[in-house]
């Protein structure tokens, strides 16, 4: 029996005991209860194309029997669909699921005969199903291509449903928007994100697929009310759990400094619990909504709002706040700093390095930073997140690391992570920390040059080792005694050591004798060489004669003067 087999399945798998999951499983596995196959590929919604007729089992209960007791007995077998009532009290009719009940035998285990029912009370009647009887996921599964990924998920922000459709779903975008608006409770507008969030203010361009062009929303999260214009600010409903988790970390006397506060999902719940908060956001619309939400939740006395660049907020407000709290002897809490800007937050961590290097202050309280980032890759996401923080800080995270937590999966091989660590004295006061990441073309060339030098050193080392090995092998060969290989009957015998009584040659004596012969030969040649005769004196040149005549004339003049 199908029903008995299904009961065994639900007994072994407790998660199928939930009412919605059980009937959804049975509805989608029953061919009679899925939309007609003719709607596949529809791009313009035609609600009439979903109409179909099926035959379903029904119990006709006599009026004299206990109708409520019988309904309780068959509760797990009821046909549950959208806009359909399986139990009609006025007509005493109960519609059962066609997959669970095929014959009267499927109902015997319930004991309906003991309650006055017989096989004649079970009938099969025709009923009409249409567009209104299926949920949005059942409609879209029947319409969209089978061989491609369907619509996986969406987020609901107030009355707006936010989609992020992939390219192959764009031809069906208007149909998808209409179906979701019809089926999702409280939805008045459906929008699709056109581009990724890459601008300064973290908002994105959107396309209205269906509904009202009204982006002013109001919602409740972690016990607080938030009102804002969804088209001008950043909001992610999937981070609701993470917002609450960080707020729960705060203890009595702690304070929160929110660098990228947005409309206040971290700051306002913390302030509502009695903690002091400094909240900042660069987006003027986010700042305006932040101030409004503080007043809406009546926490404006415990929160101070700023409209600054995140780097300026760190260098100015956070710096002065850390100094003031370390000078305040009555402060005993922890300074928490949240940095929820996954795409850029890690790059701003370098601004904490040496933040207090010029301040003469005794540090007693070390702030705890909660920075968010995207870990991209197939490796361990915690190691990737830690590496991003260490790379941008320029120092390794040692004992000051508190926690690395997974937040959510953004895309395949892309996870959002939170790294919580303390700003130690080494980070805040040290002025010799060098960032490990290249900051200019020069540093890149220096790093490349160092790599080339190391490569040359390694190559030279390998050559030296090779030369030494060759020298050792040559020395071994010199020591070996030459032997003659003799073969006998084709077999090569092992070489034997050659022994001989050769007279030892004295090389030194031979060299001395050769030198003596060269000396004798040299003396003999020099002795027989004829002596050179002196050359006759050359006659005086004309120049010399003129000089002599000049001297004689001068001597004659001297005598005449005397």
UniProtKB/Swiss-Prot annotation:
The reaction(s) this protein catalyses: guanosine(37) in tRNA + S-adenosyl-L-methionine = N(1)-methylguanosine(37) in tRNA + S-adenosyl-L-homocysteine + H(+)
Keywords: Cytoplasm, Methyltransferase, Mitochondrion, Nucleus, S-adenosyl-L-methionine, Transferase, Transit peptide, tRNA processing
Basic and acidic residues: bias regions: 523-534
InterPro entries the UniProt entry points to: MeTrfase_TRM5/TYW2, SAM-dependent_MTases_sf, TRM5-TYW2-like_MTfase, TRM5/TYW2-like_N, tRNA_Gua_MeTrfase_euk
EC code(s) of this entry: 2.1.1.228
GO terms classed as biological process: mitochondrial tRNA methylation; tRNA N1-guanine methylation
Single GO molecular function: tRNA (guanine(37)-N1)-methyltransferase activity
Transit peptide: 1-41
GO CC aspect terms: mitochondrial matrix; nucleus
Chain sites annotated for binding S-adenosyl-L-methionine: 243, 281-282, 340
Pfam families: TRM5-TYW2_MTfase, TYW2_N_2
Compartment list: Mitochondrion matrix; Nucleus; Cytoplasm
Region annotated Disordered, chain positions: 523-562
Job description of the protein: Specifically methylates the N1 position of guanosine-37 in various cytoplasmic and mitochondrial tRNAs. Methylation is not dependent on the nature of the nucleoside 5' of the target nucleoside. This is the first step in the biosynthesis of wybutosine (yW), a modified base adjacent to the anticodon of tRNAs and required for accurate decoding.
HAMAP family in the cross-refs: TRM5
Subunit structure: Monomer.
Assigned protein family: Belongs to the class I-like SAM-binding methyltransferase superfamily. TRM5/TYW2 family.
Record protein name field: tRNA (guanine(37)-N(1))-methyltransferase
Organism: Aedes aegypti (Yellowfever mosquito)
């Amino acid at each position: 029996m199908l029903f008995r087999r299904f009961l065994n399945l639900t007994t072994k798998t407790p998660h199928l005991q939930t009412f919605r999951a059980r009937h959804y499983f049975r509805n989608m596995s029953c061919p009679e209860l899925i939309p007609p196959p003719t709607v596949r590929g529809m791009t313009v919604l035609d609600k009439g194309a979903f109409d179909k007729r099926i035959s379903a089992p029904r119990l006709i209960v006599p009026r004299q029997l206990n109708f409520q007791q019988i309904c309780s007995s068959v509760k797990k077998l009821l046909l549950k669909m959208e806009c359909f009532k399986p139990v009609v009290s006025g007509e005493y009719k109960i519609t059962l699921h066609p997959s669970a009940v095929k014959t009267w035998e499927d109902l015997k285990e319930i004991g309906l005969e003991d309650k006055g029912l017989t096989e004649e009370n079970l009938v099969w009647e025709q009923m009409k199903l249409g567009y209104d009887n299926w949920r949005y996921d059942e409609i879209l599964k029947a319409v969209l291509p089978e061989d491609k990924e369907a619509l996986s998920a969406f987020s609901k922000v107030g009355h707006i449903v936010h989609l992020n459709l992939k390219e192959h779903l764009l031809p069906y975008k208007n149909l998808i928007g209409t179906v979701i608006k019809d089926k999702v409770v409280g939805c008045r507008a459906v929008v699709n994100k056109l581009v990724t969030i890459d601008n300064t203010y973290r908002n994105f361009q959107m396309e209205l697929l269906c509904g009202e062009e009204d982006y002013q929303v109001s919602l409740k999260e972690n016990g607080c009310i938030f009102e804002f214009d969804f088209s001008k600010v950043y909001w992610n409903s999937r981070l609701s759990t993470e917002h609450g988790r960080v707020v729960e970390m705060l203890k009595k006397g702690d304070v929160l400094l929110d660098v990228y506060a947005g409309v206040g999902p971290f700051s306002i719940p913390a302030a509502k619990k009695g903690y002091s908060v400094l909240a900042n956001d660069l987006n003027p619309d986010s700042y305006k909504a932040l101030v409004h939400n503080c007043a809406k939740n009546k926490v404006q006395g415990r929160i101070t709002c700023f409209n600054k660049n995140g780097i300026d907020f760190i260098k100015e407000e956070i710096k002065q706040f850390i100094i003031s709290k370390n000078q305040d002897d009555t402060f005993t809490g922890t300074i928490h700093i949240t940095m929820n800007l996954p795409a850029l937050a890690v790059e701003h961590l370098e601004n904490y390095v040496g933040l207090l290097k010029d301040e003469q202050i005794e540090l007693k309280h070390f702030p705890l930073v909660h920075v968010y980032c995207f870990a991209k890759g197939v490796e361990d996401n915690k190691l990737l997140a830690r590496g991003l923080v260490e790379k941008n800080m320029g120092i390794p995270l040692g004992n000051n690391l508190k926690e690395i937590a997974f937040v959510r999966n953004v895309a395949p091989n892309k996870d959002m992570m939170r790294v919580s660590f303390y700003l130690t004295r080494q980070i805040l006061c040290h002025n010799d920390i060098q960032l490990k990441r290249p900051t200019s073309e020069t540093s890149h060339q220096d790093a490349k040059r160092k790599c080339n030098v190391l490569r040359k050193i390694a190559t030279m080392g390998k050559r030296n080792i090779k030369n030494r090995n060759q020298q050792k092998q040559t020395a071994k060969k010199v020591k070996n005694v030459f032997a003659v290989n003799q073969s006998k009957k084709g077999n090569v015998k092992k070489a034997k050591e050659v022994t001989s009584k050769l007279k030892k040659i004295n090389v030194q004596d031979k060299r001395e004798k050769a030198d003596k012969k060269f000396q004798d030969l040299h003396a003999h040649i020099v002795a027989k060489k004829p002596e050179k005769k002196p050359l006759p004196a050359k006659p005086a040149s004309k120049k010399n004669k003129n000089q002599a005549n000049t001297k004689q004339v001068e001597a004659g003049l001297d005598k005449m003067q005397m």
